[in-house]
């Protein structure tokens, strides 16, 4: 399945759990996560969505580690099975 279709599936799954999901299209930082899932009184979830064979770039890995170093623990890489 195309990565964009898989991403829509992930968005629907998180919205069904009560999250407000924001898709980040263009940001001031390259390599930023694809999605942010928000729910009141909970830590945000930063999500990088990847297809079965699409590798995570070094910059995307750096951004994930950067978020973790800032104290965010919900930094996810979700890969299509």
Predicted regions located by residue number:
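Catalytic phosphate/metal-binding cores of nucleic-acid and nucleotide-processing enzymes, i.e., regions
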Residues: 1-81
